[in-house]
Amino acid sequence: MKVRIRGIYATALTKLFLDNGFEIVQATPQISDRFSLPIRAEPSDVTIKDGNDKGELISIGEDIYSFLRKTFQNSFIWKSPVRLYSVIETNNCKFMDYQVEPCLDKGLVVKPPSEGRIILSSPKAVGKYSMVWRGDGKTFFSEHIRDREEKTRLLSISIPFNKKGYNVKWRSNAPFASNIVLKEELEKLAIRFDNNDFRQQGEDFIKVTVSLEDKIMLDEIRKKVLPNTIRFHHMLKMSFSNEVDEIEQTSMNNEELLDKLITDYMGIEHIKPDGRKFELKEGKVIYKEVNSDYYIVRLMRVFSREGIYDGLNVKKEEGDYDIVEFDSRKWYQIHRYYNKDGKLKGIYVNISTPPELLRGKLRYLDLEVDVVKVGDEVRIIDLEELEKNKEIIGETMYKKIFTIIEEVKKIL
């Protein structure tokens, strides 16, 4: 299988994919140099790249779910139940419990399901290099096709189809195919469109929300190629760019960069298995410890609004505060809630992946289940949410969660 790789994880992923028998195509000059690879200007079967959030990896194309699940055992992995560029038939503006936008009876999936919605466009016949549909007889280009000569070449192939009333959009793989191959695909797609035959089209879309543990795993893989790779390289790359490269070329000391990420007040980003992100109330840093292998950040969060503490079922009052510690070596955070006079009201332990340090905030993947203690009573809550998200969480983390729960119960 031929793989195109882009983004901040490119070196580690290239090593990983090569070691597992994949072929690398369209490598960047830097990657080509690091691995002594020829730059193969060939179409890819699958593209791996950063998501909009550099903490995510996106795979589009052939199905490599099993390989990703085996590799990223401590991360969330979600495979879209609807293939990208497939054509679906809807019912009352819905498909598989997702709302479709716009409300078409039949449409092309142009974005995978997100926040309960699937984004559609009018049906199109989609191939490896192009899309074809009836319209005004125009040619469009992927944003990744920028070379003027290449556009001229592709236009010369699509114009005869434009004259017959077909719109053509050239996809990013098109520059790597010959004129004959491209023309043959357009002919097949035109026939498929006219026959309303969209059965075999579509690409698998997989999202990996990469945990700190798996970023460190990628650090170690990168280190085999570039021995100066520092611990937390990929995590630091989310907040810094050139600074990480400079440190690796000089001092090899990551502590300075880690310390820069810790500000007087730190936000908390709580990521759910379904991809939703929640920004929890920020806290004042009351203790920090940073060295090359780990970091600890302790926060104090003061509450001004009344309410009820989730899970604890204890009243929240003005002046209450929470003391919580984030340790990059631990799979949980213990929240201790006090009233304004310093009396303990309850303890809430959030089970999660070890926390990452980003600029001015901490981030972790929430593993759904939590442990709470009020008085002498210790309870495990939200086990049903864990079961519901077991596939995204994966078997390795699922089993680990129960070990962590027992560890937490002993502490409490």
UniProtKB/Swiss-Prot annotation:
PANTHER family: PTHR39159, UPF0374 PROTEIN YGAC (PTHR39159:SF1). The keyword Nuclease applies. The keyword Phosphoprotein does not apply. GO terms for molecular function: mRNA 3'-UTR AU-rich region binding; RNA endonuclease activity, producing 5'-phosphomonoesters. It is an enzyme of class 3 (hydrolase). It comes from Sulfurisphaera tokodaii (strain DSM 16993 / JCM 10545 / NBRC 100140 / 7). One of its GO terms (biological process) is rRNA processing. Transmembrane segments: none annotated. Belongs to the FAU-1 family. The lineage of its organism: Archaea, Thermoproteota, Thermoprotei, Sulfolobales, Sulfolobaceae. Its EC number is 3.1.26.-. Keywords: Endonuclease, Hydrolase, Nuclease, RNA-binding, rRNA processing. This is Probable ribonuclease FAU-1. Probable RNase involved in rRNA stability through maturation and/or degradation of precursor rRNAs. Binds to RNA in loop regions with AU-rich sequences.
